[in-house]
Amino acid sequence: MEKFIHNNILFAIIVRNDFHREGINFATDGKQSLEMAYMSHPAGHIIKPHRHVPLKRVTHNTQEVLFLKSGKLRIDIYSDDNIRIGSRELVGGDWIMLLDGGHGFEILEPSVLFEV
């Protein structure tokens, strides 16, 4: 998992399609309005019924998760004053959670995306 940090601000979290670790691996730390985790369990593993503790959360912007099902794109990440602070290429199977700042895309190959 790659955390895109600029000036001590977490802008994005990227999970690559070839990432693999056993068990539950949280990408987020509980400070974000969404929880994102990678899970890998063997057949027969049971995740017990559970509920999340109610929390009052204040959001100052829309956070989103994008899953690139297929294709290839470049995402540009921008600061709040619209200055490009970095770019990353994503390929089919990659995930990105956008937490702060702005973003734009260039589609490099025909692509299918899901946005949450």
Predicted features, each with a name:
Residues 79-100:
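Short acidic-glycine-tyrosine-enriched beta hairpin
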Residues 38-60:
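Conserved short histidine dyad/triad with adjacent acidic residue
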Residues 55-56, 81-83, 112:
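Short, surface-exposed beta-strand-loop junctions and turns on beta-sheet-rich folds
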Residues 49, 75-76, 96-98, 103-108, ...:
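Short beta-strand His + acidic residue motifs that chelate non-heme Fe in jelly-roll/DSBH
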Residues 1-38:
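A short, N-terminal "cap"/entry segment at the start of jelly-roll beta-barrel domains
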Residues 42, 68, 91, 98-99, ...:
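A short, compositionally biased micro-patch
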Residues 42-43, 61-78:
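Glycine- and acidic-residue-biased ligand/ion/polar-headgroup-sensing regions
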Residues 38, 65, 110-116:
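A short hydrophobic beta-strand segment most commonly corresponding to one strand
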